[in-house]
Regions:
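Extended, subdomain-level signal for the structured scaffold at the beginning of enzyme domains
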Residues: 1-65, 77-89, 97-147
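Short, thiol/selenol-centered motifs that function as redox-active sites or metal-ligating centers
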Residues: 72-74
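Active-site-adjacent substrate-recognition loops and nearby beta-strands
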Residues: 93
Length: 147
């Protein structure tokens, strides 16, 4: 089951029940050569996924291959744990900003609807930036999105 976050009133965010998904993926079975890019979502899961050694290895493999990587909201917590942000500009949910700085990256505060691109990396601070991060990720992938 997923959780969704929203910005309401004076709270930093509120959490609501999201969607039910059957999880069938196995991190140990991931071959990064089979993927053109990596998109790390936010929410609460990055706090726990960054403790999984294979998740860290996957991120490091994508960066070593200079493949496109996107991370939104709390997603950059995984990037900081993977030690791949040195010298990179990135944004995130504001509470993750100090983690980016401590990992040697440059935290860039932007509006929640914006994204920051630095080389193969695109980041956004929260779900209002879904359009911006997706647009930039598609560009990094070398794809076109037409309606």
């Amino acid at each position: 089951r997923t959780a969704t976050h929203d910005f309401e009133g004076e709270q930093t965010y509120s959490e609501k029940r999201g969607h039910n998904f059957a999880l069938t993926a196995d991190f140990d079975a991931v071959n990064t050569a089979d993927y053109a890019g990596l998109f790390i979502t936010g929410g609460r899961s990055p706090e726990y996924l960054r403790l999984t050694p294979r998740v860290i290895e996957i991120v490091q493999e994508f960066f070593a291959a200079n493949k496109p990587v996107a991370a939104i909201c709390h997603g950059p917590q995984i990037l900081t744990a993977a030690n791949v942000l040195k010298g990179k500009k990135a944004t995130a949910y504001p509470a993750v900003g100090p983690d980016i700085t401590l990992a040697g990256g440059e935290y860039v505060a932007v509006d929640a609807s914006e994204a920051v691109v630095d080389g193969n990396l695109v980041t956004a601070p929260a779900w209002p930036g879904d359009s911006a991060i997706t647009r930039e990720f598609i560009k990094l992938m070398g794809a076109k999105w037409e309606l």
